[in-house]
Amino acid sequence: MTPSSVTLNCSNCSHVLAPELNTVKAVVLGMVLGIFILFGVIGNILVILSVVCHRHLQTVTYYFIVNLAVADLLLSSTVLPFSAIFEILDRWVFGRVFCNIWAAVDVLCCTASIMSLCVISVDRYIGVSYPLRYPAIMTKRRALLAVMLLWVLSVIISIGPLFGWKEPAPEDETVCKITEEPGYAIFSAVGSFYLPLAIILAMYCRVYVVAQKESRGLKEGQKIEKSDSEQVILRMHRGNTTVSEDEALRSRTHFALRLLKFSREKKAAKTLGIVVGCFVLCWLPFFLVLPIGSIFPAYRPSDTVFKITFWLGYFNSCINPIIYLCSNQEFKKAFQSLLGVHCLRMTPRAHHHHLSVGQSQTQGHSLTISLDSKGAPCRLSPSSSVALSRTPSSRDSREWRVFSGGPINSGPGPTEAGRAKVAKLCNKSLHRTCCCILRARTPTQDPAPLGDLPTIKIHQLSLSEKGESV
């Protein structure tokens, strides 16, 4: 009996005979897609755990990245396994009802992932354009509202076919595909891709323009600072400080903070720019093929081309963790920490003691330091001074150093401060926080000349009273 006779004899049957399964092809395809899915699940879980387990990554920007990872994880764990089985068997075996649910969840996760990139691009624009005001503009409450709105819009776009906005379902239940009804195809393509893409491109064009302008301004500022002095002095005085000294302090500190903050925002924008570039390359073919095939059936591409563009879009959800790992040193260290089964909530205690420094509520402008290891208080006296200095050979903000020019008084004894390796300096009046490496001096020493002061290497800088790292 030939295949044509099988088709002829079954032309009036309610079910078409299942094609014979190619075992070798199924095994190879299953292994490839299985690795693909496993990589997406593990990679996005690592991204989420990196932020959860590392406090210095718990910022608004990384919360948006976590939301992106959640959307990609849902896609990798709830949609891709059934898509892979569909590809391996070359037919749908889970029934019509589950087919409709699977297609809706597919659109939901993909739309949420794309809109997360849109929100991230807006966040990066604000971070680069207004680096010093960013913590006040992009608060955690506003970030939560943005994430909630993102998911609400994704649900609205994805549930249309569940309420009948689709073409009639085929009689054969082994056929399952996303809706190609022209109206919904255009609506979903515009809402899920083209509108977010327009916002993303507009934001990153603005980021590029602002970054170029800001870089030129900071270079000019660096030249002026260098010709005037290689030091930016931050002094903590009593309440009778003159207005002129305070204004000069604020002006010079503003430049240092602006330089450090902008450098970090620019790096984050570059990393997420790579993410957006990969997103466009992965999703653009599918969102070109889908509406064209729906509106002009004569130009509909073959099933093979459609499947390739479909899985290329899926591939985007699996490569984002790779991008973070390759282009973001903080994520790289966090991944290494997680793979070493070591969840860091704070700075490692093996060779660093973390100190938090806050302004005393009862001692005027003095700063109180408390050691996390033993809680022993240390205090910088009101006459102490701290200086930010850039080495002449430095080319970026990572070469800025901090000098402490005043005595550090320790409660239990001088050895407590001597063992401290990591410190956080806080001054609410200027809204700055520095986490640095400190080479301590004994409390009895007189303030040394500026050139002989101990060096402190900056690890983090924060512009908020709560010490949110930037």
Swiss-Prot record:
Membrane topology according to the record: Multi-pass membrane protein
GO biological processes: adenylate cyclase-activating adrenergic receptor signaling pathway; cell-cell signaling; phospholipase C-activating G protein-coupled receptor signaling pathway; positive regulation of cytosolic calcium ion concentration; positive regulation of MAPK cascade
Residue intervals passing through the bilayer: 28-51, 65-88, 100-122, 144-167, 182-205, 272-295, 304-327
One GO cellular component term noted in the UniProt record for this chain: plasma membrane
Region ranges (Disordered): 375-416
Listed SMART domains: 7TM_GPCR_Srsx
Disulfide cysteine pairs (residue numbers): C99-C176
Annotated InterPro entries: ADR_fam, GPCR_Rhodpsn, GPCR_Rhodpsn_7TM
Lipid attachment in record (S-palmitoyl cysteine): C343
UniProt superkingdom: Eukaryota
Residue ranges annotated as Extracellular topological domain: 1-27, 89-99, 168-181, 296-303
Topological domain spans for side Cytoplasmic: 52-64, 123-143, 206-271, 328-470
PANTHER family (alphabetical): ADRENERGIC RECEPTOR-RELATED G-PROTEIN COUPLED RECEPTOR (PTHR24248), ALPHA-1A ADRENERGIC RECEPTOR (PTHR24248:SF16)
Family: Belongs to the G-protein coupled receptor 1 family. Adrenergic receptor subfamily. ADRA1A sub-subfamily.
Role this protein plays: This alpha-adrenergic receptor mediates its action by association with G proteins that activate a phosphatidylinositol-calcium second messenger system.
Name recorded for this polypeptide: Alpha-1A adrenergic receptor
Phylogenetic classification of the source organism: Eukaryota, Metazoa, Chordata, Craniata, Vertebrata
